[in-house]
């Protein structure tokens, strides 16, 4: 028997078996849950955990590190607390909180983790970029001035409070005044009131990260934060549970920094490719793939209480943004929609974000409307007035009617210029007040069918003498039908 067994054969078999053994070992840094309550957990044992790092619990729930303390780590849960108990293990992922993004996100509804919640199935993440939720804003060198208009299709906004690409324009007002209706976009990062506070807190950051993915690849993106008041409340809730020091109205001391670092990420990137490629705090996945000239425009929304714009969070965001659109309950109830208070609404970018034809036509519209409001207030105390005052009031009331616009019915900029020219220059003075909107619709129908070339010229920014003559003739024909 011993003659049949050869040492060389035994060694070959042993070597073959040893080769099949996987000698590589994976070490995970694991901690233990000390306490869990109200969407916040404290973990013992993760000494090397980093701020904003993702942690994974036994049941697959993810969490983000927010507090680094002497003997434990405080983290916020990105899922339900059910199933998480004291003594369970938690491991580090060695990944800073991020979201995987690609072009397949267009037209989808996702949560702050990038998971689809619109019932249309999972999103194909082939070739996705890992975009950090929290990222430093581009430095001044990598930006360029806001000079390209972002057409909203709303006459009141495009004419008097123009928004440019790369701008941050606040939409502020009480509940139910039409704030969301002004700004609606396609990719929605949703965290509802029923979601954990951490999901509500991180939803705007996820939206900014998706916007930056498109901006840094040379596209123009728009992000709408609806609304930052709720995010501040969610941040306050999380911070108080983590026992962070509280300040005014029990908000944490860094609530201003929370909103400023989020909104400063909106920018128009420098057109020069070599400059854009050197952008600060660029994620690894974007290095070598950045294209200049992209923009990220932010429209944050803030809900006020009884029109109080001097409260803590509203004043913070007003001071950060490049202007605000203030919506008033009284105007909304009177039927003026969008219910924009022209007097205290402003765009600090101004005419540089308007095409030339709109700038020429609407240059005095805001002042005219402010003077009309003042005159209207005084006219209530006086029965007789001179002809000039009566004409100013009539023109102002008709312009008010022209600026009213049905919900989700944007108007092309060429048509806006044409109808606003008629209003500003008093071409509708013979039209009865209750027929102004009918006259507007008939005028625009005539322009579309007979003078489409003029509308195109106006949209290109050219207000020529020929265009003005066509506008005057068309309005004269239409207005003549409404003479009393």
Model regions and ranges:
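Phosphate-interacting basic helix/loop segments used at nucleotide- and nucleic-acid interfaces
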Residues: 13-24, 153-157, 207, 262, ...
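Active-site phosphate-binding and catalytic loops of NTP-dependent enzymes
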Residues: 18-27, 97-101, 116-123, 141-147, ...
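Residue-level signature of catalytic and energy-coupling elements of molecular machines
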Residues: 33, 87, 109, 163, ...
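The conserved Walker
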Residues: 175
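Conserved catalytic/coupling modules of large nucleotide/cofactor-utilizing molecular machines
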Residues: 213-216, 230, 237-484
